[in-house]
Amino acid sequence: MAHTSETGRTGRPPAVRSLIVTVVLGVPLAVMPVRPALAAPAPAAPAPAGRRIHDVQGAGHVSPLNGATVAQVPGVVTAVTVNGFWMQDPHPDRDVATSEGVYVFTRSRPTVAVRDSVHVTGKVSEFRPGGAKSANLGRTEIDATATAVVAHGVPLPPPVVLGPGGRRPPTSTIKRLPPFAPTRDVEKGGGFDPAHDALDFYEALEGMRVRVVNAVAVGPSAYGEIPVLPAGGAGAGIRTARGGILLRDGDANPERVVLDDALVPLPAMNVGDRLPGTTDGVLDYGYGEFTVLVTATPKRADGGLPRQVTRAQRPGELAVATADLSGLSPDTPAERFEALAGDVVDGLKAPDLITVTGVQDNTGTKDDGTVADDQTVAELISAISAAGGPAYDWRSIPPRDKADGGEKGANERAGFLFRTDRGLAFVDRPEGGPSDALADDPPAAAGSRPDPAVTSVRVVRTRTGPALSLSPGRITPGDAAWGATGKPLAGEVTWHGRRIIVVAGRWFPKTGDDQPAFGRFQPPLRPSEWRRQAQAKAVAGFVRSVRAAGRDADVIVAGDLNEREYAAPVQALTKQTGLTDLSTRAPKNDRHTAVSGGNAETLDHILLSPSLNRRKHEYDVVHRNSEFAGTAGRRDPTVVRIALPGR
């Protein structure tokens, strides 16, 4: 991974992951040849009386010597980067709560080499990635004023084995807290228990050499990181059917170990790929997570994970799918369009209707006032046709410029991609409302042309059941719940004459305002969830209005809800509407649509009204993206096939 250097003070990266691959003469610093030893390798020199690294680290999240100057702290250099190095005491104490490793900040390129025995003088500090006010933990450092090399070529301290056969991290608890405990700052006290709390377990190893034996990947390579489980996953939490690990309510799987390419290149890996033997590195902290900065490139063993395909819908089955296109525009490389076409044609077997999110305007991230998406969609439809798929059509509502959040100028929106050769038709109603509206809910005045980007779709009672005043139409676009984010889109379709109301959309994503799981505030606050709760309320209100106009109305809500099936916003939507979230009917170990940091989770959903849920149906998550390097971060599409007669 190519890392960019960011400086928080002179020569200072905010965290190691941004200081990491500067090269000298084409050779990464971490793998530059060690300087020749001045003499035969010898054990580290005896330490002078004074402070040791475990005194600097202390048993807690903040050094007891923070702000103090320490002199001639001994250690062996274990890794080197552009403006500092890690060192470890070869003579540890017996307290597993105090780390024996530390990062030494030198401001400029250090002159030491791996396996040098050194004495360091400097000021102890706590460096917080993201700035002093961020929710990240601090990393204990020595801001060096003097570094004396005592000997070259000394043995490295042995690494701590993580997992079975070594020091085992807690497998469910990041930080134990009383029920309903308010959020507090762990750096200001509250106990330190590495045996039971994963946050403390990894803190007690900060800066030390660690080893992972026979690692298995539980997430794909992404941004230079690979989440793995030691010992092939022995003793870990619930595994997915395809080799990942399942995120559960109250269990974020802290036994995961994240390998980082900060010091040496790492192989591209998919879920289930393995690293046989040992993988060594230095445990570091940056931007909300502990990572192992690997010091020698391991060899990958292919796990053979296939990309899934679903079965084709049969005659009489309506197939409805979800697809997150993650910022698609005409600027997107042709290979991406081809891959998406493969998802539709091969993976999903060309469903009748796809609720789509993430479509950008015709100029992508160019902030030029463009909001139309016809060129973006035309390229996608062409790619589907070239892949052997049927002719698709498209409906969406262009947003007002820069009103829907996302990348600046991109104007992402939701939409409906559909085929009409199997009995599905889209009901276009751009103005005026349905012609058969009942007298107590008359159509809009003839000739009225509301701006669909800001006009809320209404449910209209007709002689044949509930219909929409606009199709497609946006749900409560003026509601504060949708401020600076995409608006949900409702559409009216017919299947062999049977009317169905479909809602597509993406709920507010997790943001930088959410506190990290491995941060200083426990339990972490997630303000983005508050937005999703408000959005769930808005969508639920719309669905209730549809069902109030026709108790047996056919309703489908589908898309990227950015929430897990057990989370409060999704639970609120189902409880307030009577909809069934189909993900809850799928096997727990095979319902995930995303893999985040190695945790498999369900963020994309299809929900059915009772009238459809009673019909014979089959739901499938088609794992084609989230578990693979190259498509990491993209969602797996989902599809439901409903045996549905017409009317």
Predicted features by range, described:
Residues T22-G26, P36, Q72, H119, ...:
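A generic alpha-helix preference that emphasizes hydrophobic side chains
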Residues T7-T10, L38-P48, P220-S221, P227-L229, ...:
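Intrinsically disordered, low-complexity polar segments enriched in Ser/Thr/Pro and acidic
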Residues M1-A42:
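Secretory targeting and sorting signals
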Residues P14-V16, A49-D55, Q375-E379, T580-D581:
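Secondary-structure junction/capping motif
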Residues P46-A323, G327-L353, P434-A437, P450-K487, ...:
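Extended non-catalytic accessory segments flanking core domains
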Residues L293-R647:
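Divalent cation-coordinating acidic motifs and surrounding scaffolds
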